[in-house]
Amino acid sequence: DTESFANPGCKDSKGKTTLNINIKTEPFSLHPGLANDSVSGGVIRQTFEGLTRINADGEPEEGMASKIETSKDGKTYTFTIRDGVKWSNGDPVTAQDFEYAWKWALDPNNESQYAYQLYYIKGAEAANTGKGSLDDVAVKAVNDKTLKVELNNPTPYFTELTAFYTYMPINKKIAEKYGVGLFNSTFSVLSF
């Protein structure tokens, strides 16, 4: 199958740019909370951006986050969302988009196979296994620009985890109306 991606920031004289990428099979899902294979993950990594991304040296660096603060005990992370970042429809990317996406993946009704990737977060495993509430999951959008996350234990590689596709944001307003269909990275999927 061939995917077509549009890069809204780089356009030809007709105002369009398309990048065709040949992949071996159709993605299982383009929903960050449902993707469970390398093909889906590859497409998501090209069309969504998490709080962090892994650079060419294999190290995490800021993605949607412009600033990352860690508490002295290593159990609380505060992420500041970059100014000016938008979804492909022009809506701003907010801290609420991350909170919504992570709790969506943890909701046992959604059967996210990779929800366990979020179990580092306080209350996440209990919520996903039905022994706790999603309201008790310690991820909170303090405001549009600030996401606070409390972990069960110090997890020095947590910023690397936030580059994984299960940690990508979802535009709640659009997802609840249409399902996933917006992207917050350089490219958007046009067809596959």
Residue ranges of predicted features:
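Solvent-exposed, polar/charged alpha-helical surfaces in well-ordered, non-transmembrane soluble domains
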Residues: 28, 45, 49, 66, ...
